[in-house]
């Protein structure tokens, strides 16, 4: 078992509309974070995770997740699975839990204009 308090986290400002609190369990198989999204993220274009899947659980608020060919709306209590390789963007005002498998790492996260 590994325990982390909320005092041993890293906070990342991903532009003007997204702030992420990362819990670093030092485990390459799974990652955990909480993000606050206020508006569109990314502000232009799309993001893609080339190496991880993201399971999203909505803690607060609502919004939508958009791909080039489809979109899905969500609200508190909903869950969304973003497969690796999916190009998408967020639109909303929400707080979400993100569980990544394997653990999220920066070099696989790309922005697409």
Predicted regions and their residues:
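Short acidic-glycine-tyrosine-enriched beta hairpin
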Residues: 68-85
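A short glycine-rich, His/Asp/Glu-containing loop-to-beta-strand
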Residues: 9-47
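Double-stranded beta-helix
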Residues: 2-3, 29-31, 91-113
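Short, conserved beta-strand element in jelly-roll/cupin
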Residues: 48-65
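Glycine-rich nucleotide phosphate-binding loop and flanking beta-alpha elements
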Residues: 88
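Short amphipathic beta-strand/extended segments with alternating polar/hydrophobic composition
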Residues: 5-6, 33-35, 73-77
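Short strand-coil-strand connectors
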Residues: 26, 66-70, 93
């Amino acid at each position: 078992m590994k325990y982390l308090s909320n005092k041993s986290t890293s906070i990342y400002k991903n532009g003007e509309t997204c702030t992420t609190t990362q819990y670093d369990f030092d485990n390459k198989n799974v990652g955990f974070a909480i993000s606050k999204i206020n508006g569109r993220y990314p502000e232009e274009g799309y993001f893609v995770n080339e190496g991880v899947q993201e399971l999203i659980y909505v803690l607060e608020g609502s919004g939508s997740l958009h791909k080039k060919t489809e979109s899905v709306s969500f609200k508190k209590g909903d869950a969304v699975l973003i497969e690796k390789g999916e190009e998408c963007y967020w639109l909303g005002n929400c707080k979400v839990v993100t569980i990544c498998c394997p653990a999220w790492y920066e070099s696989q996260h790309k922005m697409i204009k």
